[in-house]
Swiss-Prot record:
The keyword Lipid metabolism applies. NCBIfam families: glycerol-3-phosphate 1-O-acyltransferase PlsY (TIGR00023). It is found in: Cell inner membrane. The gene is plsY. The chain crosses the membrane at residues 5-25, 80-100, 112-132, 138-158. GO terms for molecular function: acyl-phosphate glycerol-3-phosphate acyltransferase activity. Its main location: membrane. This is Glycerol-3-phosphate acyltransferase. The keyword Ribosomal protein does not apply. GO terms for cellular component: plasma membrane.
Length: 211
């Protein structure tokens, strides 16, 4: 392993450790996502406690902190295997952030950003897979699970040299979703539409006149 590859993995982990959900909620005066909603500091939980704009902001930053280190490593000539390890390091930072007592999110958006530099065709397929699954099922977690399962096959088709590291990344995402998988199996998982309604109801109560 070269010094460059090792350095990029360290940088990727530190970038991943910057929790945009926690920081944005602090700046915006929103509740700590680790202590409200699902307890997960990620875009989906921020959607529940802060609304669409807050969730979109967190989503963009979570994608970028996976994308930028991998792109930088690619520009520096890091080999495919270590590019994959750089991507995994960014996701590990998001999941176990050193700056936030190692309590982070599930790494889906960061993983998506880390895979994006492989190619825009792959990025489009991954986006389409997630969106289609969510639209058909209503479950954001199921979209992440299906995308993680199918990602190695997409990568094998477009850029086979990245298949192994992407498969490792997919395993990491699936492990982080074991609770969601159990809730889906038992029919207890909350649909994303319900999260939007729960956010809207308190706002309606605040703005409605007293009877």
């Amino acid at each position: 392993m070269s010094v460059t590859a090792l350095g990029m993995m360290l940088i990727a982990y530190l970038c991943g450790s910057i929790s945009s959900a926690i920081l944005f909620c602090r700046i915006a005066g929103l509740p700590d996502p680790r202590q409200h909603g699902s307890g997960n500091p990620g875009a989906t939980n921020v959607l529940r406690i802060g609304g669409k704009a807050a969730a979109a902001t967190v989503l963009v930053f979570d994608v970028l902190k996976g994308m930028l280190p991998v792109w930088a490593a690619y520009a520096l000539g890091v080999s495919p295997l270590y590019l994959g390890l750089t991507a995994i390091a960014a996701c590990l930072g998001h999941i176990y952030p050193v700056f936030f007592h190692f309590r982070g999110g599930k790494g889906v958006a960061t993983a998506f950003g880390a895979i994006a530099p492989i190619g825009w065709d792959l990025t489009g397929l991954m986006t389409g897979t997630w969106l289609l699954t969510v639209l058909l099922s209503g479950y954001s977690s199921l979209g992440a699970i299906v995308s993680a399962l199918i990602a190695p096959f997409y990568v094998w088709w477009f850029k086979p040299q990245f298949t192994f590291p992407v498969a490792m990344l997919s395993c990491l995402i699936l492990m982080r979703h074991h609770d969601n998988i159990q809730r889906l199996w038992r029919g207890q998982e909350s649909k994303i539409w319900n999260k939007l309604r729960k956010k809207k109801q308190p706002e309606d109560e605040k703005t409605s006149p007293e009877e």
